[in-house]
Amino acid sequence: MNSSTSSENVFINSFSYLNQTSQAVISGNSTFANVINFPYRLGLSFIGAVNLQYEQTVKSEEIPPTLRSVFDTIGFFFSPYAIFCFVIAIVLNRFVVFYAVLNNGSRRTLPLWLSNVFHVSAVVVLAMVSLGPLTLGKDFKILGDPAFAQEKFLLNIFYAFAYSYCVETIFTIMRNSSPLEGTDYSLFELSIQFYTMTNNNTKFLDSPDYIIDCSMAILSRILIHLVEIFRLRNYRLLFSTIMNLCHICYLGIRVKQGGWKSLPFSVKFRHFPKLFSVSIICLSLLIFKLSCLIRWDPFGKSRNSCELLQFYPLSRNWKKYLNYTGEEDFSAMATKFALLLCSGTELMEKGIRREFPAINIPDNVNEKFFISGYLNELSKPYKENTSISFPKKNSSILKQRFFLMFPKSIIWIMKKLVGQVFFGFRDNKDEDIPDNDPSKMLKITKTNSLNNSAGHKEDIELELLNTSDDEYSEDYEPSEVESLGDSDEENLEEDSLIFNETRDALLDLFSSEDNEVHTDYNWIMSTSRILQQKLLSDKTLTRASILDTKLSEVDETFGTESDFDLSCAVCKVNERNTVLWPCRCFAICEDCRISLGLRGFSTCVCCRSKVHGYCKVHPVSDSK
């Protein structure tokens, strides 16, 4: 019995995760406590068995490479690099959000000395930790310091990088600016690289590529702080280009000596996009220069032989296409430039200079990009292209036109001056014409036909009302009441003869220069209305009755014109509310416009001209 008990104790001690008697949720030996504590102890035993199995598997050398990579990936998320990177990202993100809410768009200026102190402190910290990768493996006394041991200096470099990111982000956000960041050496990439180097026990002395890579990362952060201290943010791209070109030259020499496979995986993964972009740019420039060299004609009239090449517009305006400010990193600009060079192949059609479209957006859409002008709504009224292509400023055509037009301009100016002097001495005052009865009679007989306008309507009223009570027209027939008041017939005949002679003299006086009296057909047409009313009416004609008749006709004419038909010219049902451009026809409704557009109509239904677009209007009728 004792032997069996001792063997059980040895078995439990060899597997410590089985002994969970000390762990309990409810203390005591009651049935309720055992029911609760048994699943809890069973779960703890299972977790202990899994942990023991994991430790033994990691220590064994027979583990497959794929399974080891899975273990390394899981272990990275619990490493100090990943945890610190996650905490820094959350803190900076919350700071940016809360500061944007509290700031409320107002610009705040921080003291320069405060930001300079923190930037200088970041530079000092980065310089101190950079002594590790630069002097590692050398027999220097500084390596005796425990802070520069291989197990600790990678973590110190990572902490220095995190401090540099915090200083740059916080102080640039407080100045309402954008922080300067490096695309090659982000905090997350450095955490993965440092964890891999620590987990694999990589020696810096055996891998100088890691030393150069860490040195480039530190120099990029120091460069950011220096341009912030000296206020040279616009020159950051220049300094970054010089530094990266030197590093690319080193990588080229390194690949030439040991091959591409000799580089560590993290170095190849980080710098391959930059190297690929630089290769595309160099290859494009080389092909462009060779094309220019082939087209170059030393004896030709044209000085520039590359204008017909597809790359020529970009070579002249590449700064506008890239739209850089100088604050960008070299890797980001190289990638952007390479993408710009490669995106042109998607826009090219049969190689006819369609690689790079115009930068300015046109006012109207090209006709081949929409089905019909009835479907192209214009936000502004259509403007016809009335631009004239003038010759250049120093062209020979302009000089010839100037010399030809100069004498004509002088002659025109002289004529103008002589005319002003000549007409300046003339008396242009109008002579007053006596307001007598025969002249008024002549004026009435020479009036034009009645026009359908409101102004002419008022003129008719004034003309008929201001006429004197005496009537001298030949077709006037006095009433019987008026004839009784006359003296006798002989006096009337004498007066009429005198009046006729006076009228004939006035007509001769106001006739044309050739003394030929022309027949006034307007006067005949005006008297036809009086004759017609005389034949249709038995009453005596008076001036008031004629005036009432003419005014009623004018009112009827205005009434008919004001009632304009606003129904659609196509369906005759809906109200028209669409203006077509550029013909300006206001003829159709919205439903008919959509129907005509979907059917592919491109001409106006009224004038048959080309339709480029339409505008919606809201007509207001008198009935409303």
Curated annotation (Swiss-Prot):
Its main location: nucleus. Its EC number is 2.3.2.27. It comes from Saccharomyces cerevisiae (strain ATCC 204508 / S288c) (Baker's yeast). One of its GO terms (cellular component) is Asi complex. A zinc finger (RING-type) spans 568-608. It is a multi-pass membrane protein. It catalyses: S-ubiquitinyl-[E2 ubiquitin-conjugating enzyme]-L-cysteine + [acceptor protein]-L-lysine = [E2 ubiquitin-conjugating enzyme]-L-cysteine + N(6)-ubiquitinyl-[acceptor protein]-L-lysine. Glycans are attached at residues 2, 19, 29. Residues 91-116, 174-209, 295-624 are nuclear. Glycosylation is not required for ASI1 function. One of its GO terms (molecular function) is ubiquitin protein ligase activity. It is found in: Nucleus inner membrane. Pfam families: zf-C3HC4_3. InterPro entries: Znf_RING/FYVE/PHD (IPR013083). Residues 1-69, 138-152, 231-273 are perinuclear space. The keyword Transmembrane helix applies. It comes from the Eukaryota. This is ERAD-associated E3 ubiquitin-protein ligase ASI1. Keywords: Glycoprotein, Membrane, Metal-binding, Nucleus, Transferase, Transmembrane, Transmembrane helix, Zinc, Zinc-finger. GO terms for biological process: cellular response to amino acid stimulus; proteasome-mediated ubiquitin-dependent protein catabolic process; protein ubiquitination; ubiquitin-dependent protein catabolic process. E3 ubiquitin-protein ligase which transfers ubiquitin to substrates promoting their degradation. Part of the nuclear inner membrane (INM)-specific branch of the ER-associated degradation (ERAD) pathway, required for the elimination of misfolded proteins in the INM, a specialized ER subdomain. Required for ERG11 degradation. Negative regulator of SPS-sensor signaling. Together with ASI2 and ASI3, prevents the unprocessed precursor forms of STP1 and STP2 that escape cytoplasmic anchoring from inducing SPS-sensor-regulated genes in the absence of inducing signals. Residues 468-490 have a biased composition (Acidic residues).
